[in-house]
Amino acid sequence: MPAFPTMSNRVEVRVKGTAAGIMNREDLVAGLCLFILLVYCTATIFVKAAWPLQSFQMGVFALLAVYLVTGIRKREEGAAKGVAPLLVYFIPVWGLIQILAHTTTSTFQTREAVLRWGALAAVFFLVQIVVRTPAAREIALHAMLFFATVMALLCLTQLFTSKGLVLWIFPSGYPDVYATFPSYNNYAQFIEISLPIAVWYSLRKGLQSWGYILLAGTLYASVIRAASRAGAALCTAELLAILAMRAIGPLKLNRRETKLRMRSITLVLALVPLVAVTFTFVVGWRRIWQRFQQHDDSYLVRSEFLIPTIDMAVHRPLIGYGLGTFPDVYPQYAIKDFPFYLNSAHNDWAEFAADGGIPFLLLVLIPFAAVVPTAIRHPWGLGLVAVMLHACVDFPFPRPAVSGWLFAMLGLLYVARASDRHEDRFKISPGRHDPPTVLEFKH
């Protein structure tokens, strides 16, 4: 069961005079609607038609419109302040500039990209507005974790029984499916976002954290069984990084967790990887081992995608060829013919530079890079760093079933950063605040 923050007399966090643990009805309903939309987007990713993505976008825009009309004056202080988070809202604007300036090679493709980026920016905004308190953040993190676990169980079950049928009903066109994901890489990216949540909570709760340990083992084993090499490497890195951070103790500077005896901590540090490895042996590790052993040319081929992509960025460094136009423009720069349609550069960062120029690359990169220190301070957010790295060899951003959760995590980290700064101001000048009666929290 989720462990909610306990009362303490150390720090008090207030939002317009409201205790930090309280989540009002408007926030709860809006948060639930947003969660349902993200679940819906993930559940329909296997559908090749446009209507699932379009209906997700319409739902997010409708939710944003309703929330702005009914609550903007009351929620205006919720969104993160500063240049970096503000840049997120300029990402879709860049596509509009390309359309208005007639610099895009395909107005249709750029318009679609603007809608997709606009929906992601709306998710980012809504998460910050809705999940403003530590208690709300706990609920959001646990919702993400439990949905990811359901998807992991579905993935493992289908890999052994479905023979390429999504939910045992819908043909995918592939020999295997990974929950509702046709691509094992996209599935791995989805799990990368949630795995650190399970690992970190398992280490925070000591011997009472067996439930989180099982969840972490399930998530990790599902990625190994899915046989995404980059996903397996990054999930392993996430697991080891959080274990090392907890063992070495660099997080003592912001430790606000329940104090555990050293014996309990040591035991949990041993149990988490043990359970992960055990679950991996149960579901099977040979496939991923074979993929690491095989000497295929997949990464060499990706370098042959990357070189023309960089060439595209060099030719139009300021404005790019238009958001979403890479598949149309790439053949003009290709250094080799391939017997398949290339829909992505398999490096999102390079593709951003090709589609939107260097300014667009910075519009996307800066908001994510700025929050990396917060992800290190709050390890439940390390999945954001993992997906950023995975984007160097694949394409998670064009898939809202992945990037929707990624932008939600981005919003949560900016909320955590604002909370940290509020705390620091409290410590520096406690005399200017009311006597504390509060919520102790450490996420």
Walk through the language-model features, giving the residues of each.
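Alpha-helical transmembrane segments of multi-pass inner-membrane proteins
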Residues: 4-10, 21, 28-46, 57-68, ...
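Juxtamembrane membrane-water interface segments that cap and precede transmembrane helices
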Residues: 40-51, 101-102, 168-180, 300, ...
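Aromatic-rich transmembrane-lumenal/periplasmic boundary elements in polytopic membrane proteins
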Residues: 119, 154-165, 280-315, 319-321
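Short, intrinsically disordered terminal tails adjacent to the first/last structured region
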Residues: 1-23, 310, 420-443
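Short, hydrophobic transmembrane alpha-helix segments
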Residues: 42-55, 72-78
